[in-house]
Amino acid sequence: ILANAKTISIGSTGFTKGVLNFINFTQTGSTAQSLLLTGSSQTVIGPATSFGGALTLSSPGVQLNGATFSGTTNITKTGTSNDDGRGGNTFHGISTIINNGTGYLKLGNNNPDVFNADVQFSTTSTGNFYVADNSAGNQFNGNTTFNNTGTGTDVRMMIAENTNATSTFNGDVTINNSGSID
């Protein structure tokens, strides 16, 4: 448990390899958290995890495996790994999730995700982005924006790609594609 008004910080030498796990982790209060990981490191959030405040995370690898995000959430994947998030996440605040890496990023691979406010998904490099990938019952309760500005060939933004996947959009959906697609 992270007490109210406390923060998590990366030390002066950085976090360049290995895995930063937030499993059975609870942040009480609404203090904003900001984490920057580099190199070949990964961040795994969940299961049984909750962030009470805003979260800004930039990490080479990202797996979202069952967490509740109460504040504004900004997550950017920057690395080469292929990351399969199990899903089971609930986002209560406005959220932005970006794949700026060369490996793919999957959300909702086993369990549905719920977005209770506006959400924006973007792929900005050569890695594909799979949203609501392989789970039934994904919910998008605010406005949803999908951006593909990826570079390279065959860069894809995929929504509910697999046969098991279902999604309900209760707000407007905007799709922007200015990337390179074959």
Language-model regions, residue ranges each:
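Extracellular beta-strand-rich, repetitive "passenger/adhesive" scaffolds
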Residues: I1-T90, I94-V114, D118-Q139, N143-T168, ...
